[in-house]
Amino acid sequence: MARVLAMLFISMVVSGYYFPFSFAVFPQLNTKMALAMTGVFLVVLQGCRRHKISFSKELLGAIIFAFVFSFICFIAADYNHTDDYSYVTYFISFFTWLGGAFVVCFAIRMLHGKATLSLLTGYLTFVCVSQCILAILIDRFPAFQLLVDTYVSQGQEFFQEVRRLYGIGAALDPAGVRFSIVLLLIAYLLCENEDVKQAKWKVSVYLFAFFVIAVIGNMISRTTSVGLLLGIAYLICSTGIFRLIIRRSYFRLYSILGGMLITFIILGVYLYEHDPFFYRNIRFAFEAFFNWVETGELRTDSTDKLNTVMWIWPENLKGWLIGTGLFANFVYSTV
């Protein structure tokens, strides 16, 4: 029981890092920033014990890249004589994410004795499925929505204005990008991790999570479709099913996948016909598919907006080479 509670606590830490939010009583500080400060403390403490603070070559390369990116943005702003330094301080954001990530890995290592990609993927999968469930509960039950909105500050007024699903820290494109990453990680585990491939219950759990995140995640943010398509492509390429031959090692995977696919399709059709909440959200999630079936055009309102007001290309050679030095305040009408 104590181990289960510890795993739930780590899941909360992972969620606070991956989907940061603020509490209404102190909206200036979000969970990612709090974890980053904790991470700095842990790094200093660990450094004092070991008498050194070391970085891997891969991490050092990422740190250098962050500083180079910030410097380029500074040059662009200075050269164009603007006072827009939105991305000049990117390295601060980088170290904030890095500090929070250290806490997550530290917590996982404390409980499991190691911090591996498979363990991290397991926690991220649980967190993403939980966020999807929370989003449905918030959308369907006003009392629960009021409870969340009372204690959590995450700009929910805008989400409600545009009628978008949201969880606790999970909303709009940032959530879609993070859902996409987890879908890819799940596909990787299903194809490459022998412990997962040999355990029927693990295959079933990860496939169920894949379907839940793919469907409800798209209801929250259609950017999730990117991860869905890449995840499917990874499954197809890694298992070799495009050759119309299923290898013995992947037979369990595809047998469970086929059963779940049929189940989710039947359930989806039933809810589409009988549940107005599901009807509205599923049509938003897969608007491109419904438009293609009903009108023959593969388009969405989002892609129309991208093509008209959001894809802004440089108008001269200087803009292509050094940029305009303008990033923030939607100067290019990106909303």
Regions found by a protein language model. Name each.
Residues M1-F9, H51-A66, T116-L124, K200-V205:
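Membrane-interfacial loop-to-transmembrane alpha-helix junctions, especially the N-terminal start
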Residues M1-R50, F71-A77:
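N-terminal signal-anchor transmembrane segment
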Residues Q28-Q46, F91-G100, G176-L184, V226-A233:
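Membrane-embedded alpha-helical segments of multi-pass membrane proteins
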Residues A62-V68, H81-R109, L119-Y123, C128:
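Aromatic-anchored transmembrane helix interface
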Residues S118-D149, A170-I220, T224-I241:
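Alpha-helical transmembrane segments of multi-pass inner-membrane proteins
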Residues D139, I236-E294, P314-E315:
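A membrane-periplasm/extracellular boundary helix in multi-pass inner-membrane enzymes
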Residues A143-R164, A328-V335:
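Interfacial juxtamembrane loops and adjacent helix segments
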Residues E161-R164, F278-Y332:
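Membrane-interface loop/short-helix elements at transmembrane-helix boundaries
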